[in-house]
């Protein structure tokens, strides 16, 4: 093996890292750890804004409104079923 570097020396140089790169990684890890987030699961409060108008306290009212609308729709369908439909040309 002539004038080149050995494969072991090349591998050693690849395995070494620059100390400034490690410092950057450590600062990111430290800031992530101090944010009290454990990943995507806890990211939801970060993306919700204060402009969000609905919350869990509004849910019973919204469900009640849906139930009322559904009841009215059912009553209208029952009325329609009780009355025979007349063809358009019979009334003339």
Curated annotation (Swiss-Prot):
KW Protease (keyword) present: no
Phosphoprotein listed as a keyword: yes
Positions bearing Phosphoserine: 56
One Pfam family of this chain: PKI
Residue span of region Disordered: 1-26, 70-92
Biased composition (Polar residues): 7-26
Keyword tags: Phosphoprotein, Protein kinase inhibitor
Residues of the site described as Important for inhibition: 37, 40-41
Single annotated GO MF: cAMP-dependent protein kinase inhibitor activity
Basic and acidic residues composition-biased segments: 70-82
InterPro entries reported in the protein's UniProt record: cAMP_dep_PKI (IPR004171)
PANTHER family: CAMP-DEPENDENT PROTEIN KINASE INHIBITOR/PKI
Recorded family membership: Belongs to the PKI family.
Function: Extremely potent competitive inhibitor of cAMP-dependent protein kinase activity, this protein interacts with the catalytic subunit of the enzyme after the cAMP-induced dissociation of its regulatory chains.
The name this protein goes by in its record: cAMP-dependent protein kinase inhibitor beta
Species per Swiss-Prot/TrEMBL record: Mus musculus
